[in-house]
């Protein structure tokens, strides 16, 4: 590890080395400017990562950053949840993983992204799953677009701490 690499630090609860199938992978965080919808992700990669990469490296980009460049980060105040979103969000299990669809604004965006019928069917399946003591059925049925919706959480960089971020296109 170079001297520069030894100065990297992981976010709380994260590690710089991940082991997958017995192979260690080093995660090197790359600090950028605040990425917005005015950025082109290819330009961001060239500007910040090109000189750090070596032959055989794999570059991972957070889907939240990609979504922001695609104008898929919506200010909370621009989302007007319908009654159905308010009602459904009350039944979402809160987890340490994040807010998920547990607030009306994120549930509203799930209804828009996935369709009302699909979300209602996912909610129905979730009830059946709970009766059978099985978790996760809602997100399995609702699909990746619902599963990937991020709401504002503590530690999110402003201004995105007041945004709902959808999955990238």
Language-model features: locations:
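N-terminal and secondary-structure boundary signal
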Residues: 2-169
């Amino acid at each position: 590890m170079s001297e520069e690499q030894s100065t990297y630090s992981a976010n709380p609860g994260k590690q710089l080395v991940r082991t997958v199938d017995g192979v260690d992978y080093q995660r090197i965080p790359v600090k950028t400017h605040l990425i917005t919808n005015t950025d082109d992700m290819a330009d961001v990669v060239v500007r910040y990562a090109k000189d750090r990469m070596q032959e055989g490296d794999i570059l991972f980009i957070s889907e939240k950053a990609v979504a922001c460049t695609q104008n898929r980060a919506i200010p909370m105040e621009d989302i007007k949840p319908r009654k159905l979103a308010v009602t459904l969000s009350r039944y979402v299990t809160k987890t340490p993983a994040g807010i998920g669809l547990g607030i009306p604004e994120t549930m509203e965006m799930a209804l828009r992204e996935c369709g009302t019928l699909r979300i209602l069917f996912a909610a129905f399946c979730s009830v059946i799953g709970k009766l059978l003591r099985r978790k996760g059925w809602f997100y399995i049925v609702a699909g990746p677009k619902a599963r990937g919706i991020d709401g504002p959480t503590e530690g999110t960089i402003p201004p995105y701490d007041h945004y709902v971020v959808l999955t990238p296109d």
